[in-house]
């Protein structure tokens, strides 16, 4: 069964007011989601920012490589156009704005 167990999303920026931004919450635009009703499926799903670093790190059960991941979770909807809010274990770096986030299709709530 080929295929991926994640949906594509873009990190649009941080949760913010007019003058202040709150870096502890990320705003994600999930591909193919255009209304608040469609967001319900993604609530509670795990998300991951996968990136490459300069130094290698040990990966569990594998060879050391340069790939790293920051894990997070979709917490709630943001607005009426299919944006979601997500909290990550450590805040996403600003260089990640506009880059791909993986929204995993687990855990299932069905």
From Swiss-Prot:
Top-level division of the source organism's lineage: Eukaryota
Molecular functions (GO terms): structural constituent of ribosome; tRNA binding
Main location: cytoplasm
Compartmental location: Cytoplasm
One BP annotation, GO: translation
PROSITE patterns named in the record: RIBOSOMAL_L35AE
Entry keywords, A to Z: Cytoplasm, Ribonucleoprotein, Ribosomal protein, RNA-binding, tRNA-binding
GO cellular component, one term: cytoplasm
Quaternary organization: Component of the large ribosomal subunit.
Its job: Component of the large ribosomal subunit. The ribosome is a large ribonucleoprotein complex responsible for the synthesis of proteins in the cell.
Family: Belongs to the eukaryotic ribosomal protein eL33 family.
HAMAP family: Ribosomal_eL33 (MF_00573)
Stated name of the protein: Large ribosomal subunit protein eL33
GN (gene name): rpl35a
């Amino acid at each position: 069964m080929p295929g991926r167990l994640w949906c594509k999303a873009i990190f649009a920026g941080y949760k913010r007011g007019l003058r202040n931004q709150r870096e502890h919450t990320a705003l994600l635009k999930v591909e193919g989601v255009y209304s608040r009703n469609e967001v319900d499926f993604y609530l509670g799903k795990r998300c991951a920012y996968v990136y490459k670093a300069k130094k290698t790190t040990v990966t569990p059960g594998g060879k050391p490589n340069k790939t790293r991941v920051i894990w997070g979770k979709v917490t709630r909807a943001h607005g009426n156009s299919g944006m979601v809010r997500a909290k990550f274990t450590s805040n996403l770096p600003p260089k990640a704005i506009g880059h791909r986030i993986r929204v995993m299709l687990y855990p299932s709530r069905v």
